Regions:
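Residue-level signature of mid-helix packing/kink "hotspots" within the transmembrane helices
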Residues: 29-37, 120-121
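Paired small-residue
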Residues: 62, 73-81
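Helix-breaking motifs and short loop linkers at transmembrane-helix boundaries and internal kinks
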Residues: 47, 68-73, 102
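Juxtamembrane intracellular "pre-TM" segments in multi-pass secondary transporters
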Residues: 160-195
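Structural signature of the two symmetry-related core transmembrane helices
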Residues: 50-64
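C-terminal membrane-cytosol helix-exit motif in multi-pass small-molecule transporters
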Residues: 145-165
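Cytoplasmic helix-loop-helix junction between adjacent transmembrane helices
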Residues: 78-117
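Membrane-interface helix termini in secondary transporters
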Residues: 40-41, 45, 129
Length: 207
C-alpha cells in the first residue's frame, strides 16, 4: 500500500527526479538483499518468534512517520529502515510455515504466498485510490492501521519453539553457527539452482 504507486508519487511531490524515485523505491530491496541471509540464519539459531516479532513491528509502525517527511534524504533513510521489516520477517515467516506443515508443506507455502500476493495486488490499488481522493497522509496512515492489525493478529499467535542452538554468549559462537548454515546451503546444488532461477525471473520482471 505504501510502496507503489503512492511512494513514487510522494517522492515526486517532494521534488525527486526519475533516478531518485527509482532509488527511493528500490532502497528497501537493497536492505533485503543485505539482511535476508543473516536474518534467516539467526532464525535457525535463536528461533523464529523473536525475529518475527521484530519484523512485524518494524513493518507496521513506520507508515505513521511518512506524513511528517519533507526531505528526500529523510525519505530514503526511512525506506531503508522500512526495508528491514521485509528482510527480517520474510525468511522467518516462510520457515515457520514450513515448520508447521511438514507433511503438507507445498500446500501450506502455496497458501502463504497466495495471501501475500493478494495483499500485493490490493495494496497498490487501495493506496493509489486513497492518495488521489484523500491525499498522501491518509494513504500512509491507512497503511499504518493495516500494519497495527497485523501486529495484533501476530502477537495473538502462540508459536512453540525449540531451544536456541547457541547457548554460549558472545558473537563468535553465533557467527560460527551461521557459517555452518551458509556452508550447508552453498553445498546444495538444487537450492542454488532454484534460487538462481528465481533471481533471473525477478530481473526479467523488473526490466
Amino acid at each position: 500500500l505504501v510502496r507503489m504507486p503512492v511512494l513514487s508519487l510522494f517522492a515526486e511531490s517532494l521534488g525527486a527526479g526519475p533516478e531518485r524515485i527509482g532509488l527511493i523505491v528500490s532502497v528497501s530491496t537493497i536492505t533485503g538483499v543485505l539482511l535476508k541471509l543473516p536474518s534467516g540464519a539467526l532464525s535457525d539459531i535463536y528461533g523464529r518468534k523473536m525475529l518475527l516479532r521484530i519484523g512485524v513491528v518494524a513493518f507496521g509502525l513506520p507508515p505513521f512517520i511518512y506524513p511528517f517527511i519533507s526531505d528526500l534524504n529523510a525519505l530514503t533513510a526511512l525506506r531503508f529502515v522500512h526495508g528491514l521489516a521485509t528482510a527480517i520477517f520474510a525468511p522467518s515467516a516462510l520457515a515457520t510455515v514450513a515448520d508447521l506443515y511438514k507433511e503438507r508443506r507445498g500446500a501450506a507455502l502455496g497458501t502463504y504466498t497466495a495471501c501475500t500476493q493478494s495483499g500485493s495486488l490490493l495494496g497498490p490499488f487501495l493506496g493509489g485510490w486513497l492518495a488521489y481522493t484523500a491525499g498522501f497522509s491518509t494513504a500512509f496512515v491507512t497503511a499504518g492501521v493495516f500494519g497495527c492489525i497485523a501486529i495484533l493478529i501476530f502477537f495473538s499467535l502462540h508459536l512453540d519453539e525449540p531451544p536456541p542452538r547457541v547457548r554460549e554468549r558472545g558473537l563468535a559462537p553465533v557467527m560460527a553457527e551461521m557459517g555452518k548454515g551458509f556452508l550447508a546451503v552453498a553445498r546444495n546444488r538444487k537450492v542454488l539452482i532454484t534460487s538462481s532461477t528465481d533471481a533471473a525471473k525477478m530481473v526479467a520482471n523488473g526490466a
